[in-house]
A protein has these predicted regions:
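Non-catalytic DNA-binding core/recognition domains of DNA-processing enzymes
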Residues: 1-18, 32, 108, 141
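Residues within the helices of the helix-turn-helix
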Residues: 2, 78, 179-182
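Basic, Lys/Arg- and aromatic-enriched nucleic-acid-binding interface segment
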Residues: 5-9, 20, 24-26, 30-77, ...
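Major-groove DNA-contacting interfaces characterized by cationic-aromatic clusters
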Residues: 26, 37, 92-96, 111-144, ...
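Catalytic-site neighborhood detector that most strongly recognizes the C-terminal catalytic loop/helix
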Residues: 44, 97-101, 178, 185-210
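Short, basic (Lys/Arg/His-rich) helix/loop patches that form interaction surfaces
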Residues: 55-63, 73, 102, 106, ...
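Short, polar N-cap/turn motifs at the start of nucleic acid-interacting alpha helices
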Residues: 86-92, 155, 176-197, 224-226, ...
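C-terminal secondary-structure termini that scaffold catalytic or DNA-interacting sites
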Residues: 130-133, 191, 210-241
Length: 241
C-alpha cells in the first residue's frame, strides 16, 4: 500500500507539472482515492520464527548479528545499519533516530553483547557490513536480510521491521508499561505502542494480571486481619465460665 501511495504521489506531481505547462488540460489522477485496507502493518515475528532463524544462522554470522540488533534494540533498519562500536559506551548504545530525530540511550542486552563480541569485525564504522566491508544502505540491507530469511525457510512476511514489533511484544509480555516500551522504541505515540503490542501473548498476560489482583487482595486481607490479643473474643467468656 505504501508503494501505491508513493506512485500516486509521483504521478500527481508529474501531471501537475504537465498541467502548468499546458501539456494537459486536466489532471488525470484528480479524484482518485486509495482505499486503505485495515491492517496492523508488518508481521510480528513469532518465537518459532525467531528460533528457526537462529537455528539456521549461527552466532558469529552477520545474519545472526542483524537479528540480535533488531530484537534487542527495537530500532528501524535505517538506524540499525548505522550502529557501530563507537556508539556503545559503558554498556549503553546511543542512537539518534533518523525518522524522528529522537536521541535514545539503550542498555545493551547481555545476549546482544555476546553476539557482537563473537562476530568478526570487518568494517570500522558499522557493525553490519557487506562482504567487502562496506556499510549497508537501508534498502540493500533489507534485500540481504530477506535473503537470510529465505535461507532459513521463513515465509515472505518475515521482514526486518517485524523484529521491532517482536521486541515490543516481548517487552509487553515481560510486563513493561507502554511508557517503558516507548523509551526503547522511541515512539512518541502510545497508540502506536498499543498497535505494536497487539501480538503479545494474551493468555500469559491475563494470567499475570489475575495473579497480581489475587496477590493484592490477599495482601489487603492480611492487613485487616484481627489481632486476637486486642479484639475481644466471645468464646473466651464461654471457656472461662
Amino acid at each position: 500500500m505504501a508503494t501505491r501511495r508513493r506512485w500516486l504521489t509521483a504521478l500527481r506531481s508529474f501531471f501537475r507539472w504537465c498541467e502548468q505547462r499546458k501539456l494537459l488540460r486536466t489532471e488525470p489522477t484528480w479524484g482518485i482515492r486509495l482505499k486503505l485496507p485495515k491492517s496492523d502493518g508488518h508481521h510480528t515475528w513469532s518465537e518459532d520464527e525467531i528460533a528457526a532463524f537462529e537455528a539456521h544462522h549461527a552466532v558469529g554470522s552477520k545474519a545472526r548479528l542483524a537479528l540480535a540488533l533488531g530484537l534487542f534494540t527495537a530500532q528501524r533498519r535505517g538506524d540499525v545499519v548505522k550502529i557501530g562500536r563507537q556508539h556503545i559506551r559503558d554498556g549503553v548504545l546511543a542512537v539518534r533516530q533518523q525518522k524522528t530525530g529522537a536521541s535514545l540511550a539503550i542498555p545493551i542486552h547481555p545476549e546482544l553483547a555476546a553476539i557482537i563480541a563473537a562476530t568478526p569485525a570487518v568494517g570500522q564504522l558499522t557493525l553490519l557490513t557487506t562482504k567487502s566491508g562496506r556499510s549497508y544502505s537501508a534498502c540493500v540491507f533489507s534485500e540481504q536480510f530477506c535473503a537470510w530469511c529465505d535461507a532459513a525457510g521463513l515465509p515472505q512476511q518475515c521482514v526486518f521491521h517485524g523484529l521491532r514489533k517482536a521486541a515490543a511484544r516481548r517487552l509487553a509480555e515481560a510486563g513493561c508499561t507502554a511508557h517503558e516500551i516507548a523509551a526503547l522504541t522511541g515512539h512518541a505515540s502510545l497508540r502506536e505502542i498499543e498497535r505494536y503490542t497487539r501480538a503479545a501473548d494474551q493468555a500469559s498476560m491475563a494470567r499475570r494480571a489475575m495473579a497480581k489482583t489475587a496477590a493484592r487482595e490477599q495482601s489487603g486481607m492480611e492487613s485487616v486481619k484481627p489481632d486476637a490479643n486486642k479484639v475481644s473474643n466471645p468464646l473466651k467468656k464461654l471457656i472461662n465460665v
